[in-house]
A protein has these predicted regions:
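A short, exposed helix-loop element centered on a Lys and neighboring polar residues
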Residues: 140-141, 198
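A short helix->loop->beta-strand "cap" motif at the edges of active sites that frequently abuts
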Residues: 47, 150-152
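Substrate-binding pocket helix/loop in short-chain dehydrogenase/reductase
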Residues: 117-118, 124-126
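NAD(P)H-dependent oxidoreductase Rossmann-fold/reductase module
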Residues: 1-106, 111-113, 118, 160-170, ...
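Helix-to-beta-strand junctions that scaffold the AdoMet/dcAdoMet cofactor pocket
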Residues: 147-150, 205
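Extended catalytic-interface subdomain
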Residues: 155-158
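Ankyrin-repeat alpha-helix packing hotspot
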Residues: 133-134
Length: 318
């Protein structure tokens, strides 16, 4: 496949951003890494940013950093939310709906990765599936009407990991009671997130509710804190070594795809995967990359949606 050159040889760049005054962006997992850099980029253009983060201390520090960079009047705040707790996601969504009048984009950026040994969330889900997929599924559902009223977007930050592992959903053992591996479980969780996005696109199209656009992107290999926070010591060391090579880009570059998907008005193709288009699609100019068909296998997507509604106890009204 030829690299996408929609945005020229350098790909999408933040210079394309216009003034974002009056727009509100919600970002999950925005106190570090690509999520934090996305918040910076949006604030720089006068947007309002609400972070949805698990750690209060790290969020307070991130808000303080951003206000010291952009001034005390910068519109940045946080709401505490732990994606690993469905009850907590519901509380956070209530807070959002009580305090945020419009949502121009909800960027589902938070994730945990490479959890060394199998752990369960308080709801009994394998931790990566519970956090990355179920938590975001519920959050998007609870905020959907507000996003739709704002003619906003949902941006799912996926990972090239979807193309590793089983390349399908292990319906007979989604919580990995047998055969748990940090990478295979992570890959399934990211594939599930992509399938959620692509199935949502289909459901909205059938219902004629096309005000909300749903985009899927990935950061490529960016030097974010993902592996360093939840991976094993060996994985963290390997990643640290990799960050010293040209196969890894900065966290700021890693945020380009999600900011592009949240703001770029010329994007039209929603059944796509946006991200770096250079070597191995891990680095390089940002545009439309390769999307492998197992990510939108209709039978699997439809079944996953039904299972996810059952598991989360939340039924989308589309």
């Amino acid at each position: 496949m030829m690299p996408d050159i929609t945005f020229g040889p350098k790909g999408w760049m933040p210079e394309r951003l216009g003034d974002l005054s009056g727009k509100t962006f919600l970002i999950t997992g925005a106190n570090a890494g690509a999520g934090f850099q996305a918040a910076r980029m949006l604030l720089k253009k006068n947007a309002k940013v609400v972070m949805l983060n698990r750690s209060v201390e790290k969020s307070q520090a991130a808000v303080a950093d951003l206000k010291s960079e952009f001034g005390s009047e910068a519109e940045v705040s946080f709401i505490r939310m732990d994606l690993a707790s469905l009850a907590n996601v519901r509380e956070a969504a209530d807070q959002v709906l009580n305090s945020v009048t419009r949502i121009d984009a909800l960027i589902c950026n938070a994730a945990i990765a490479q959890v060394p040994t199998r752990k369960l969330t308080e709801d009994g889900f394998e931790s990566q599936l519970g956090t990355n997929h179920y938590g975001h599924f519920l959050l998007c559902g609870l905020l959907f009407e507000r996003i739709e009223a704002s003619k906003g977007r949902i941006v799912v930050v996926a990972s090239l990991g979807y193309n590793m592992g089983l390349k399908t959903i292990k319906f007979d053992d989604m919580n990995w009671e047998e055969g748990y591996g940090p990478n295979t479980a992570y890959s399934q969780s990211k594939l599930a997130q992509m399938m959620f996005a692509y199935e949502l696109q289909d459901l909205l199209a059938v219902a004629g509710r096309t005000e909300v656009e749903v985009y899927v992107c990935h950061p490529g290999s960016s030097a974010t804190s993902l592996i360093s926070t939840s991976g094993s010591r060996t994985m963290r060391f390997i990643w640290w070594l990799m960050t010293k090579t040209p196969m890894v880009q900065t966290a700021e570059q890693g945020s380009y795809p999600e900011v592009m998907c949240a703001t770029e008005e010329t994007l039209t193709d929603q059944r796509a995967l946006y991200g770096p288009t250079g070597r191995l699609e891990a680095v390089g100019p940002v545009g439309k990359g390769t999307l492998h068909p197992h990510a939108y296998d209709k039978t699997v997507m439809t079944r996953l949606w039904e299972v996810t509604e059952q598991e989360t106890g939340f039924k989308w009204k589309i």
